[in-house]
Amino acid sequence: MIIVGIDPGLSGAVAFYDTVEQTVEVVDMPVLELVRNGKKKREVSAQTLANHLAGRKIYAAFLERVNAMTGQGVTSVFSFGRSMGIVEGVLAAYDIPVTLVTPQAWQKAVNQRAGKDGSRERAMQLFPSQADLFQRKKDDGRSDAALIAYYGAKTL
């Protein structure tokens, strides 16, 4: 059974947790660069995300529900909401059941230590044969996605 965990930000990731093999495959959130009003912008690539999901027997997806943070600008909040919408739309197109989960819920359930390093450390503990996926500080999106998928598998 494949459970998908998604950290939906532009520096997030998508994790495919195989509950039988107890392994995880992680891909960085697919993004594309485009120019709007003369400025370079990045957004989630719906087509590439769909390609990553295609052909897999996915049982369910768990998507991190993140709210706007104090101090974020309107453009930033809109951009994040657009990313969430793209991800939810692609999952819906593949008829994959989606559960939204707060960071607090999944972090507590997987016994994650606080902070981004805590996420990477916990992912390396749970998936030691794939620890190289979570080695770098910037791999926190990967570790979050993997832990969200693990959380999803444990709560089904």
Regions found by a protein language model. Name each.
Residues 1-156:
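Phosphate- and other anionic-substrate recognition elements at nucleic-acid/protein interfaces
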